[in-house]
């Protein structure tokens, strides 16, 4: 792992009783310094973030610009908005091995994860700062989940703001 990698990690329980956030009125733009720092974090292991392989926070911002900000389970919506406003990719670690990949959407598309920091379970890689595996995504039946904010020490103040916001919200769960 990069010495600059500074994750926020939460293990949470969700009973579905709390409302999720509203989509932001205006679509926040991710500042260039944030994009640069997050992409540098991904490049550490040799991954090349671009196109479909860009950080999840950038994909989310683009979806928002295009009016494609779907409403999904409130807990996922909450972290999508935190990602959108902070610019940090957020997933629910090791570097991906050569040839390792996982399906990230219902149509079966794969993300090659060689060189990326990945979350794994007994079945293999399950998430990364680019996309999460389809088989491990949170849905309406999810009660317990794991969240990672893929932060970097270069943006410590911004990460502290995210931590305070998430701590405040999760203290009510």
Description of each model-found segment:
Residues 1-173:
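Charge-biased, low-complexity intrinsically disordered regions
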């Amino acid at each position: 792992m990069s010495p600059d990698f500074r994750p926020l990690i939460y293990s949470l329980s969700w009973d579905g009783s709390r409302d999720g956030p509203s989509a932001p009125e205006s679509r926040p733009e991710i500042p260039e310094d944030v994009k640069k720092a997050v992409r540098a974090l991904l490049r550490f292991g040799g991954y090349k973030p671009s196109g479909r392989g860009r950080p999840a926070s950038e994909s989310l911002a683009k979806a928002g610009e295009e009016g494609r900000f779907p409403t999904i389970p409130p807990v996922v919506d909450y972290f999508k908005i935190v990602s959108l406003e902070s610019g940090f990719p957020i997933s629910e670690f090791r570097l991906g091995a050569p040839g390792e990949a996982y399906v990230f959407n219902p149509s079966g598309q794969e993300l090659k994860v060689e060189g990326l920091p990945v979350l794994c379970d007994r079945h293999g890689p399950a998430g990364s700062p680019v996309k999460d595996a389809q088989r491990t995504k949170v849905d309406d039946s999810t009660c317990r989940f794991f969240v990672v904010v893929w932060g970097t020490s270069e943006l410590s103040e911004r990460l502290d703001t995210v931590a305070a916001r998430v701590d405040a919200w999760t203290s009510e769960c």
